[in-house]
Amino acid sequence: MAAASGYTDLREKLKSMTSRDNYKAGSREAAAAAAAAVAAAAAAAAAAEPYPASGTTKRKYQEDSDPERSDYEEHQLQKEEEARKVKSGIRQIRLFSQDECSKIEARIDEVVSRAEKGLYNEHTVDRAPLRNKYFFGEGYTYGAQLQKRGPGQERLYPPGDVDEIPDWVHQLVIQKLVEHRVIPEGFVNSAVINDYQPGGCIVSHVDPIHIFERPIVSVSFFSDSALCFGCKFQFKPIRVSEPVLSLPVRRGSVTVLSGYAADEITHCIRPQDIKERRAVIILRKTRLDAPRLETKSLSSSTLPPSYASDRLSGNTRDPALKPKRSHRKADPDAAHRPRILEMDKEENRRSVLLPTHRRRGSFSSENYWRKSYESSEDCPEAASSPTRKVKMRRH
């Protein structure tokens, strides 16, 4: 049997099998030794290089992302620096107690009541959706009242066109500010009461530098809110960008603006910051060289025949001004639908003939629909036009 398999005896076969097993074992040992050598080389390379070669790509990615991160950090630093400048021009004092606030708020309600009864001069009261303004001492043209838009176009009304500052403002508000050395004696000659309903706002602006001295002093009543700096407004629907600084204003607190906060950056009241009724009394001093509307310089040929009698009765309506806004009360639900504010009132001057796809849902301005209705009464051609399919109605 051993000869048939090619081996002379059994010992030769056993010897050949042993040598084959030794070869296989040697191959395995050699492979293990080679792997150990590779591992040792890798360890030596790692000791020489702090980061593995595979980290090169990651490091390159980090280097590539550094400029982007740097731009973001630079933007944040600029924003923080601007906020610091704004804060440097702000002074806040918690000055009025709860009882004092209640007394002043009752007086503000009296002002609102007198205005509803028509007891003030025409230019004393200015109404807008969810916000009414009451000018005392000095009033000025602004926003949609201007023939030309833009900073520097504001003008003071002629003397006597707005009512005098009420005695209670002097006694309950101004005198206390003087006693605490917030303002000097005799500083204030202009007082404005802004009365906001929930959702009301005032767009970003700078108090006219050519009209008012600094500082600008305001006192808050009825509820807490916030004064925001550096916001941008967009409309239809209204949207407001993030502010550079949002300053909490508490009921009974006094806010004094000067320097950068008053002159170099806009401030506003956002709709989302008026959750309850809020009123603010703004106290300022007009500049001696502030421009003023001069009704006397207008040619008599441009004035209506009744101008002289109106002037004597105190009912002045300067033809240089645009018609006043509606004196209707704002709808309480107006805060929950798109509103047309002062900066986009130009839409109201377009054609009263609306196409079908622009029905009432596209506009919420009370004046727009009322003017459209009245125009249809004045213009029979428009009323009978086949293109006019929208039925106008008062609301």
UniProtKB/Swiss-Prot annotation:
This is RNA demethylase ALKBH5. Its EC number is 1.14.11.53. Residues 60-83, 329-350 have a biased composition (Basic and acidic residues). The modification Phosphotyrosine is found at residue 72. Residues 296-306 have a biased composition (Low complexity). There is a cross-link at residue 329 (Glycyl lysine isopeptide (Lys-Gly) (interchain with G-Cter in SUMO2)). RNA demethylase activity is inhibited following sumoylation. Inhibition is relieved following desumoylation. Inhibited by histone demethylase inhibitor IOX1. Pfam families: 2OG-FeII_Oxy_2. Gene3D superfamilies: Alpha-ketoglutarate-dependent dioxygenase AlkB-like. It is an enzyme of class 1 (oxidoreductase). The modification N-acetylalanine is found at residue 2. Binds 1 Fe(2+) ion per subunit. The gene is Alkbh5. Its cofactor is Fe(2+). The C-terminal disordered region undergoes liquid-liquid phase separation (LLPS) for the formation of paraspeckle membraneless compartment. The modification Omega-N-methylarginine is found at residue 360.
